[in-house]
Amino acid sequence: PDHFDREAAEEFSARHKNALVYIPSRREPAPETLSVGNFTVELHRVRHTQVAGYGKSTVDAMIVSCEGNCVYVASDTAPEAAIHEGILAGRKPDAAFWNGEMLLYKPERALLHVCAEKSFIYHIPIDPQDGLRRKLERIVSRYPEELENVRLLAAYPSVITL
């Protein structure tokens, strides 16, 4: 609810005729998997992080696999280690993408180190003076050993090599 843009999704679909576009419906269960070519996407409908004014909502966390690589996209899942541990079920993806809230709590920070080879934090405000951005930067610098595999994505788009 906080940043879905139906018009942008429809424009993307019109420009990329061969792309599979999945737009979740909160009234229908998520499919367990989507497959396109060599890509497989596992969908896990879970609790969305708290968003003021929206009450309780859900989001689809995803595990994307292709040609031996695996990426976990936590989306805006609530920052609870148990949710992510349940989705990953002992798997260790090559990379994981997390909301910045995961850095705010000790059990969730610990998860970033053990649940993926590389962890990337997104939704980082672009303004270097933004309070949330500065707080996340301080947390990463405060726990260098615990967060050695964590990188803040402060520029969009970013190039990531697995």
Where do the protein language model's features map onto the residues?
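Binuclear metal-ion centers of metallo-dependent hydrolases, dominated by the metallo-beta-lactamase
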Residues: 27-37, 56, 85-90, 109-162
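Divalent metal-coordination and catalytic microenvironments
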Residues: 5, 41, 76, 96, ...
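Short, acidic/turn-prone active-site loops that include or flank metal/cofactor-
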Residues: 25-27, 46-47, 100-103, 122-127
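Metallo-beta-lactamase
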Residues: 8-69, 144-161
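Active-site metal-binding motif and surrounding structural segment of the metallo-beta-lactamase
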Residues: 1-25, 88-97, 104
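Glycine/Thr-rich phosphate-binding loops of Rossmann-like dinucleotide-binding domains
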Residues: 4-6, 81, 106, 129
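Active-site-proximal loop/helix segments of hydrolase catalytic cores
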Residues: 48-114
